[in-house]
């Protein structure tokens, strides 16, 4: 009966040990988390007053679109007994391509433009966005390091992961994956510019469909009944509207908060793609199929950005 409290105590001890053994990662997580909190505090009042309330509404609707797409993909698992590993890797590669292109076309480039109007074009603008990129990478690196989770190829990751139920490990992995997507949606609507928000939200929603399906099938593979696996996969999509609120909050406080937050969201998404998604698509020897899927997703996002931007 003391197992949960024992696990919590062990996690606290493991976190302390990891912090001592890897001080740079710990410092990076602390710095990035502090930066996010400061941006959020600075922006929360501004985001909820005046015309910015409309921007919050856009962000929530965008996050809801991501949630609905995840739910649609998860529900598709009810009619599928299984899909081949090659098909799954192609779908995840497609999602990775859309995330990479969204990071470039809908976050980094608009971030550079926004920073250029504040500090002037050139190296100064690039430095502002690069600061955000660094914060995003440090945030996700720290969360990845200190959060127990599991990957199909590398197994248990993070402190005390071997003692946590496999279903919860997958859920934590999904949370780590969906949070930056939701943040990106929120940041893209921070100024109310639909030319930035719509392409990015469309891209994330499109790639959320195969992701939702893959999550439901993965949860079924670790032992959950199909109905419960679908429900958990659907619920995982709630991180997107929650992340969208965080995203619009951190980017609405002051002028430089917007380009910094664009870089932060891009850095977080690129980290997830490189650290999580692409390695998973290569685990079964389907690198070529996954790469073709990635390029198709990248091209589609480029088209969406041109057509809707």
UniProtKB/Swiss-Prot annotation:
List of residues binding Cd(2+) 3: 144, 275
Primary location: membrane
Positions on the Periplasmic side per record topology: 1-22, 82-83, 146-165, 223-224, 276-287
Disulphide linkage map: none
rRNA-binding keyword on record: no
Residues that bind Cd(2+) 2: 178, 181, 208, 211, 240
Transmembrane region(s): 23-50, 56-81, 84-119, 122-145, 166-190, 193-222, 225-251, 256-275, 288-308
InterPro entries: ZIP
Binding positions for Zn(2+) 2 per the UniProt entry: 177, 276
Catalytic reaction annotation: Zn(2+)(in) = Zn(2+)(out); Cd(2+)(in) = Cd(2+)(out)
Residues noted as binding Zn(2+) 5 in the record, renumbered to the chain: 89, 286
Effect recorded for residue 106 to A: Is more tolerant to high Zn(2+) or Cd(2+) concentrations due to a decreased metal uptake ability
Sequence positions that bind Zn(2+) 3: 144, 275
Residues binding Zn(2+) 4, per UniProt: 144
Residues in compartment: Extracellular: 51-55, 120-121, 191-192, 252-255, 309
Bilayer topology: Multi-pass membrane protein
Keywords: Cadmium, Cell inner membrane, Cell membrane, Ion transport, Membrane, Transmembrane, Transmembrane helix, Transport, Zinc, Zinc transport
One cellular component term from this protein's GO annotations in UniProt: plasma membrane
Further details from the record: The zinc flux through ZIPB is extremely slow in comparison with typical ion channels and is nonsaturating with respect to a zinc concentration up to 2 mM.
Record function comment: Selective electrodiffusional channel that mediates the uptake of Zn(2+). Exploits in vivo zinc concentration gradients (maintained by cellular zinc homeostasis) to passively move zinc ions into the cytoplasm. ZIPB-mediated zinc flux is dependent upon pH, but independent of the proton motive force. Is also able to import Cd(2+), but is not permeable to Co(2+), Cu(2+), Fe(2+), Mn(2+) and Ni(2+).
Domain notes: Has an additional transmembrane segment in the N-terminus compared to many other ZIP family members. This extra helix is important for activity in vivo. The two metal binding sites M1 and M2 that are halfway through the membrane form a binuclear metal center. The multiple conserved zinc-binding sites (M1,M5, M6 and M3) appear to constitute a route of zinc release to the cytoplasm. M1 is the primary transport site essential for activity, whereas M2 plays an auxiliary role presumably by serving as an additional transport site and modulating the properties of the primary transport site. Cd(2+) at M1 can readily be replaced by externally added Zn(2+), whereas Cd(2+) at M2 cannot.
Family: Belongs to the ZIP transporter (TC 2.A.5) family.
Protein name stated in the entry: Zinc transporter ZIPB
């Amino acid at each position: 009966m003391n197992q949960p409290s024992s696990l919590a105590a062990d996690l606290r001890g493991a976190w302390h040990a990891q912090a001592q053994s890897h001080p740079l990662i710990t410092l990076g997580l602390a710095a990035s988390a502090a930066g996010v909190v400061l941006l959020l505090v600075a922006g929360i009042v501004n985001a909820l007053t005046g015309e910015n309330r409309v921007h919050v509404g856009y962000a929530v609707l965008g996050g809801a679109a991501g949630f609905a797409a995840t739910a649609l993909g998860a529900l598709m698992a009810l009619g599928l007994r299984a899909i081949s590993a090659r098909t799954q890797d192609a779908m995840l590669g497609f999602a990775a391509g859309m995330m990479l292109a969204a990071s470039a076309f809908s976050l980094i480039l608009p971030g550079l433009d926004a920073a250029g109007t504040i500090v002037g074009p050139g190296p100064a603008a690039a430095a502002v966005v690069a600061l955000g990129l660094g914060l995003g990478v440090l945030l996700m690196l720290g969360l990845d390091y200190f959060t127990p989770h599991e990957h199909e190829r590398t197994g248990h990751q993070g402190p005390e992961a071997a003692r946590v139920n496999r279903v919860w490990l997958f859920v934590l992995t999904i949370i780590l994956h969906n949070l930056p997507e939701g943040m990106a949606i929120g940041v893209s609507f921070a100024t109310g510019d639909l030319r930035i928000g719509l392409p990015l939200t469309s891209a994330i929603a499109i790639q959320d469909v195969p992701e939702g399906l893959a999550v439901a099938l993965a949860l079924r593979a670790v032992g959950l009944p199909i109905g419960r696996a679908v429900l958990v996969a659907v619920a995982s999509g709630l991180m997107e509207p929650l992340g969208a609120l965080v995203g619009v909050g951190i980017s609405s406080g002051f002028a430089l908060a917007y380009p910094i937050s664009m870089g932060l969201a891009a850095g977080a998404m690129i980290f997830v793609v490189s650290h999580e998604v692409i390695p998973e698509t290569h685990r079964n020897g389907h690198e070529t199929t996954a790469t073709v899927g990635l390029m198709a997703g990248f091209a589609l996002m480029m088209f969406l950005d041109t057509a809707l931007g």
